[in-house]
Amino acid sequence: MPQPCRRASRVLVTAVAVLSLAPTPVAAQAESSADFVPVTDAMLQDPAPADWLMWRRTLDSWGYSPLDQIDQENVGKLRMVWSRALGRGNQQGTPLAYDGVLYMPNPGDVIQAIDAVTGDLKWEHRRDLPDDLGDYLGGLVTTKRNIAIYANLILDTTGDDYVQALDVATGDVVWETQILDYTVNPALQTAGPIVAGGKVISGRSCRANATADACVITAHDARTGAEIWRRRTIPAPGEPGDETWGGVPFEERKHVGTWMVPSYDPALNLIYMGTSVTSPAPKFMLGGADKAHLYHNSTLALDADTGEISWYYQHLNDHWDLDHPFERLLVDTAVSPDPAAVSWINPRLRPGEVRKVMTGIPGKTGLVYTLDRETG
């Protein structure tokens, strides 16, 4: 049931306005679910300028807003209109904005719907989490970076290793599906999902006290919660990549997580996710320093319909816990790097040719990589 906001929190969500501008308030959310316009795949692929429908706003993970009402000339005139306390815990959440409502993930699996104009709370959902979660998952279990919206649902991954859907009008649970048993194979779900072609795509940080079966990327039907596929990031004996582990027993292969939010190219129907390190990180403690131990510290391009790995690119064979899970930026651009500015250029590259690329700083090394997102 909805409960009052915890006012004791030190964290605030704020709204600001430019005092000298004519007021152009965002329309308030419709009073009934019958008036709500469901969010479609087309809207996710090309959101209206005022909408922020996912963590980085668009499926290509740009994090860019085309709105231009606030500019260099008037930004100094911004003033607070309202503020609202958020829940206690490790706050890394980004709100969604749609139809005059902010949908805000709070620490500890609390989601709020807030009127964007007034700051009034429309509803709040608090998941009833087990008391022993911290024993299995540690202190980061309260962290939540993002949620997703699709149709008339708010979609989320939970601290107790479920994926759930809430009614956008009420916050009531519509469906929930268990992904893992946290007492057997604990995984931190600090990043929420995206929706790609009606499928809820989510990754997680599998713990060192779990098996390789916790290191999975999953897809669920957004409307029903039925699992469609799951993809391990650590190969089992006999699977492609098994030979890169140097004979390490499967039960000792651990910790290749996908703990940030994926990107998606609907034209190629490929999902792009980055992976973390092994546990332990130094490879001489596993199969040998010369072994790749796939698919750690890699970019994975997955078929959105099947979860099959279309291609992978390993950024480095890591020994120092330098994860590479961060957002992958999808860009169509004329690739023409300055040879003096980069350490390596593909000799097959034709300067000035427009390519579909994946770029950005995917890992903790701070290096920029640019890959062909069709082939890797």
Segments and roles (model prediction):
Residues 1-8:
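N-terminal secretory signal peptides that target proteins for export/translocation
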Residues 30-80, 233-240:
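Blade/loop signatures of beta-propeller domains
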Residues 52-56, 88-110, 136-163, 188-211, ...:
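Repeat-blade elements of multi-bladed beta-propeller folds
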Residues 73-84, 111-138, 150, 154, ...:
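Extracytoplasmic/lumenal domain signature
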